[in-house]
Structure formats: structure tokens, C-alpha cells
């Protein structure tokens, strides 16, 4: 339970005495969908890691408020801290994708003593959902027809296709996340960071810019992947596990052998 009374669902895997990796999913996804069904949990536990996967507020089995004020980026970063405190974890490694990467950027800046290194997948600078048309989205869920804006329609269609998603909560999250500090080249965390973005993702150059501005950033281009299918990439998983283990990661996944 968070300080503002929100129940945040967590999932624990592996040996609790091993070093911990925290997994935080993307927009409209869930801990199990983003990480367990895609092989991440299996591979991390197989590498001897203790894994905590989080359903972010508004997602999965966590509470789904319809109040945008519940979803400031600082609040989502604080949820990560609450989970660390609940599990009595002094220091962890972090893996986040898309929304989870943006939250990880903020959490790494706010709590550098708790997050030793982070994998930030599919992260651009700023807020990638600035163009999301809130009123068109609300009209859609009220039965008023599909959004005219293509980006808004794409995200709503994707979210609606995932069981148990609450579209009103997700729209509130988009609105609430517009408040507060966003990732920029001027506010990079100082921990070692692995930036991983699909070669076919439109945000790839913005991800590269964030990496270049990070004191200890490494960039990994996920071959043949876009923003939506990058999390299932075996090359991405292999690069992330290598990075977390302190093994140098090549700039491209072309030479990585899948597991």
C-alpha cells in the first residue's frame, strides 16, 4: 500500500537472498504480460537473480484511479521506492520499458542510493504522449466514435485489446503524467544505464540523444524491432542480462546469439 492508499500489485520470483532486479512495464501492459510471458523472468531467475515485478498503478492487478492527480511521474517513482521498502531491499538493479523506463529515469535520479544501474528500454526524451488527444479518447470510451488522431487511436486500440485494462484509468494516467519532470538531456541519472530501443522505433534517435547525455550510458539497438514488439526480443534480453552482470554490451544486437 502506497502513502496515498493505492494498492500496488507485485510478483516475486527466484531466490530472495540473491541480488534483486526490479521490473517495471510499459503503458497499458502489466508485470506478467511485459515480463513473465516474454521470457524475462525465466532468464533472470535462470541467471541467479531475485526478481520483483511491479504492476504500476492504473495497470494489471493494482488499483486503477480515475483521478489524473494520482499519476504524477514523481508519484509513480515513489511507488517503486515503496516496493523496495516493503521488501526491505537496500539496493536493486532496475529494468523498465517505455513508461516503465520513464519512471525508472525519475526513480534513478531521486533515489540513486537505491538503484545501482538501470536498463531503460524504449525511452525518448520528454513525454511521448503529448500528442495524445484526451478529449477524443474520452469521447471514444463514452461511445462517441473512434478518435480522429492516429496516435490516440493506436494507443486506445492497443490498450482495449488487453484484458482487464481500464481505459478511463489509462487516460487519466496520460493526463497526470504530463505534470512534473520528464527525461531530458539536461537531467540524466549518473548511474550506469543501458538504453535499448528497436531499430524500427520512431523514437530511436531521441533515445540515442538521452544516452549521449548520460555520464555512464550505453546504447543497444534492438535489431528488427519497433516500439511495441521490442520487449519480446531475445537479443534485448541477452543484452540486458549481460549489462546487469557487468559484461560489456555491443552497440547493436546483430551479433548477439539468442537464448
Regions found by a protein language model. Give the residues of each.
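Conserved HGGG/HGGXW glycine-rich cap/lid loop of the alpha/beta-hydrolase fold
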Residues: 6-63
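Conserved alpha/beta-hydrolase "nucleophile elbow" surrounding the catalytic nucleophile
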Residues: 25, 92, 96-101
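Active-site loop/oxyanion-hole signature of alpha/beta-hydrolase fold enzymes
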Residues: 36, 42-46, 53-93
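Flexible "cap/lid" loop of the alpha/beta hydrolase fold
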Residues: 102-110, 116-145
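Active-site nucleophile elbow and catalytic-triad environment of alpha/beta-hydrolase enzymes
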Residues: 169-185, 200-202
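Short beta-strand/loop motif that positions the catalytic acidic residue
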Residues: 189, 195-197
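Short alpha-helix in the alpha/beta-hydrolase fold that links the catalytic acid
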Residues: 204-212
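Catalytic histidine-centered segment of alpha/beta-hydrolase-like enzymes
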Residues: 225-237
Amino acid at each position: 500500500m502506497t502513502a496515498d492508499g493505492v494498492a500496488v500489485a507485485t510478483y516475486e520470483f527466484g531466490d530472495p537472498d540473491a541480488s534483486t532486479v526490479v521490473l517495471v512495464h510499459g503503458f497499458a501492459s502489466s508485470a506478467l504480460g511485459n515480463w513473465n510471458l516474454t521470457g524475462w523472468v525465466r532468464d533472470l531467475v535462470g541467471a541467479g537473480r531475485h526478481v520483483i515485478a511491479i504492476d504500476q498503478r492504473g495497470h494489471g492487478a493494482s488499483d486503477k484511479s480515475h483521478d489524473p492527480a494520482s499519476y504524477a511521474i514523481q508519484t509513480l517513482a515513489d511507488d517503486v521506492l515503496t516496493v523496495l521498502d516493503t521488501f526491505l531491499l537496500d539496493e536493486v538493479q532496475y529494468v523498465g520499458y517505455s513508461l516503465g523506463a520513464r519512471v525508472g529515469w525519475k526513480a534513478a535520479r531521486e533515489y540513486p542510493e537505491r538503484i545501482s544501474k538501470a536498463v531503460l528500454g524504449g525511452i525518448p526524451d520528454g513525454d511521448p504522449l503529448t500528442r495524445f488527444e484526451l478529449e477524443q479518447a474520452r469521447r471514444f470510451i463514452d461511445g462517441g466514435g473512434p478518435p480522429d488522431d492516429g496516435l490516440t487511436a493506436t494507443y486506445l486500440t492497443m490498450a482495449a485489446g488487453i484484458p482487464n485494462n481500464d481505459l478511463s484509468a489509462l487516460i487519466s494516467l496520460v493526463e497526470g503524467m504530463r505534470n512534473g519532470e520528464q527525461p531530458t538531456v539536461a537531467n540524466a541519472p549518473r548511474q550506469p544505464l543501458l538504453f535499448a530501443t528497436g531499430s524500427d522505433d520512431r523514437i530511436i534517435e531521441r533515445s540515442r540523444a538521452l544516452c549521449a547525455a548520460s555520464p555512464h550510458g550505453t546504447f543497444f539497438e534492438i535489431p528488427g524491432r519497433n516500439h511495441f514488439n521490442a520487449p519480446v526480443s531475445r537479443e534485448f534480453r541477452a543484452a540486458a542480462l549481460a549489462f546487469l552482470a557487468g559484461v560489456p554490451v555491443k552497440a547493436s544486437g546483430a551479433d548477439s546469439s539468442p537464448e
